[in-house]
């Protein structure tokens, strides 16, 4: 099916598709897709996707409120599953989780059957705080290697409920992905835990009741937290937790969160 132009409009929001072809309910080809949407009367998306030798996505605004989940998303209904191409992304402003702002986000990469297999990107949180994301694909061993560094931690930890209440810190996340299984290491430096029920639960499991009370009150400072984790479909297992701070050292293993 070939459609020269298809427009959807609701109030100020609009979606315009040009030169689009469908095959088996999926997009097989397109020229341009223009997206402009509003949330609570404020513009939250304004960008254009162009498809030529490579797919280019450029815009002034992009809503990535579910950034962490988006990076790990596995969707059998991916509309771009027919595409294997180089990709270039350039957004002036991105809204990430917890209403943080990421500016001047640029990405070069490649998708295979609609999924990223290669990424090199950088964004600016302001005040000399940056986000770097890289992904490499090992075709021989059928593995992907994902690495994320961020000077701002909270927007990237929203997928993990036990990090609620974490303040400050710098984050380094590395993961080896093979099919539906990922083995990852998360390292956070120089942060504080304040009113964090999930972290309090972990401290209680380690028989550190007094420090758990402190984490609920004035807060608990850490120099380093390292977590080795394994995720298989919806099951998350924390294989090892090492936390070091001025008044605490914790080593745990085997905590499971589904």
What are these regions (language model features)?
Residues 1-236, 241, 245-258:
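Membrane-proximal interfacial segments on either side of biological membranes
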């Amino acid at each position: 099916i070939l459609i020269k132009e298809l427009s959807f409009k609701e109030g100020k929001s609009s979606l315009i598709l040009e030169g689009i072809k469908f095959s088996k309910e999926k997009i097989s080809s397109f020229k341009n897709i223009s997206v402009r949407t509003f949330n609570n009367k404020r513009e939250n998306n304004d960008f254009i996707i162009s498809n030529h030798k490579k797919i280019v996505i450029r815009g002034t605004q992009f809503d990535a409120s579910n950034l962490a989940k988006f990076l790990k998303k596995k969707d059998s209904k991916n509309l771009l599953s027919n595409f294997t191409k180089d990709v270039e992304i350039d957004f002036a402003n991105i809204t990430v989780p917890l209403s943080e702002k990421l500016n001047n986000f640029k990405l070069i990469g490649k998708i295979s059957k609609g999924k990223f297999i290669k990424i090199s990107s950088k964004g600016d949180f302001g005040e000399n705080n940056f986000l770097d994301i890289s992904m490499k694909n090992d075709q021989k061993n059928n593995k992907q290697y994902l690495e994320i560094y961020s000077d701002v931690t909270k927007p990237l930890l929203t997928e993990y409920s036990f990090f609620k209440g974490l303040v400050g810190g710098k984050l380094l996340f590395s993961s080896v992905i093979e099919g539906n299984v990922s083995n990852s290491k998360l390292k956070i430096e120089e942060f504080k835990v304040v009113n964090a029920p999930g972290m309090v639960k972990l401290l209680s499991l380690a028989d550190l009741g007094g420090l758990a009370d402190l984490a609920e009150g004035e807060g608990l400072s850490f120099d380093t937290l390292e977590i080795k984790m394994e995720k298989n479909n919806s099951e998350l297992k924390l294989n090892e937790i090492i936390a070091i701070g001025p008044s605490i050292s914790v080593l745990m293993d085997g905590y499971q969160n589904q």
